[in-house]
Amino acid sequence: MTNIRKSHPLAKIINESFIDLPTPSNISAWWNFGSLLGICLILQILTGLFLAMHYTSDTMTAFSSVTHICRDVNYGWIIRYMHANGASLFFICLFMHVGRGMYYGSYTFSETWNIGILLLFSVMATAFMGYVLPWGQMSFWGATVITNLLSAIPYIGTNLVEWIWGGFSVDKATLTRFFAFHFILPFIISALAAVHLLFLHETGSNNPSGMSSDLDKIPFHPYYTIKDILGLLLLIMVLMLLVLFSPDLLGDPDNYTPANPLNTPPHIKPEWYFLFAYAILRSIPNKLGGVLALIMSILILAIIPLLHTSKQRSMMFRPLSQCMFWLLVANLLILTWIGGQPVEHPFITIGQLASMSYFSILLILMPISGIIENHLLKW
């Protein structure tokens, strides 16, 4: 068995990635989220495939086809809610994974980090298009508002929006193409994830101390496979608690009303995992400025490696930087809350302050903390 594992061309790749992979002996549970993201992706592809067998991407029948899945298809309701809530867990794991990378300085693996950012954008695009497919009120108006942001691009904006819509408004053509892209993107994400792992295995994993762990490596299997199974069981438990007890907890009640272009919902808002970016978008009165801030709120991750001023890689032994990191986390929670609130006083002011804080912490306070810590350690 050992010989086949180490000699067969295909088995050798699996062996070097998941079995005999030399792994630092001190990585914590924060390193569990990579494998959980892989599980989430597989789960989403499988549930999505079964949903696509019964879904129709036509404005006249999309909403009723989703109802049909929930009422008439065998276990359709559980597949539908596993897919919807699976997306929420996917994003929870994503945010934890990115946060861990920022805290422990994993962004110094520049190729792995940049492909990770590309993966984040791809998953966000997929989730947005998936939210449009049930063709409820929030699906329709969410699609209208978000695609309309492209009209802020000077000169070509309006043409670009109409090209994406396939007409003069969000309609049948838009829904059909969103379904096509929503179906193909997870496979592109899978390919990107494989490249993400390829680059990670070129350097080996980082560890909480941020120091080289070449002296102390252990095989991935059985030590971390068994550790990952615990994370997997917890993930499935949380997912099934959500699906079986409160499947609509994270959804919007407006999406149970069929899409109506003549009736605008009082508060148009995206799913909870986009609310932080939506709050940043809304905090700037200018349309183009808001769109740029929205893009930069994610793209700022790409310049984090350039802003690393500390002589230590990880934040494990840097209390000042730790304070800044947790301040950023609290700030993101405030932005998420504000994104779901109506545009009125005092939420507008809180949103603007939180948006300013978000960019200030990342661009100014964190690099300054690193410099101060270097001086305190007389480096």
Swiss-Prot record:
Heme b b562 binds at residues 83, 182. GO terms for molecular function: metal ion binding; ubiquinol-cytochrome-c reductase activity. A ubiquinone binds at residue 201. CDD domains: cytochrome_b_C, Cytochrome_b_N. The chain crosses the membrane at residues 33-53, 77-98, 113-133, 178-198, 226-246, 288-308, 320-340, 347-367. Its cofactor is heme b. Gene3D superfamilies: Cytochrome Bc1 Complex, Chain C. InterPro entries: Cyt_b/b6_C, Cyt_b/b6_C_sf, Cyt_b/b6_N, Cytb/b6-like_sf, Cytochrome_b, Cytochrome_b_C_euk/bac, Cytochrome_b_N_euk/bac, Di-haem_cyt_TM. Binds 2 heme b groups non-covalently. It is a multi-pass membrane protein. PROSITE patterns: CYTB_CTER (PS51003), CYTB_NTER (PS51002). It is found in: Mitochondrion inner membrane. GO terms for biological process: mitochondrial electron transport, ubiquinol to cytochrome c. Heme b b566 binds at residues 97, 196. One of its GO terms (cellular component) is respiratory chain complex III. Belongs to the cytochrome b family. The cytochrome bc1 complex contains 11 subunits: 3 respiratory subunits (MT-CYB, CYC1 and UQCRFS1), 2 core proteins (UQCRC1 and UQCRC2) and 6 low-molecular weight proteins (UQCRH/QCR6, UQCRB/QCR7, UQCRQ/QCR8, UQCR10/QCR9, UQCR11/QCR10 and a cleavage product of UQCRFS1). This cytochrome bc1 complex then forms a dimer. Heme 1 (or BL or b562) is low-potential and absorbs at about 562 nm, and heme 2 (or BH or b566) is high-potential and absorbs at about 566 nm. Component of the ubiquinol-cytochrome c reductase complex (complex III or cytochrome b-c1 complex) that is part of the mitochondrial respiratory chain. The b-c1 complex mediates electron transfer from ubiquinol to cytochrome c. Contributes to the generation of a proton gradient across the mitochondrial membrane that is then used for ATP synthesis. This is Cytochrome b. The lineage of its organism: Eukaryota, Metazoa, Chordata, Craniata, Vertebrata.
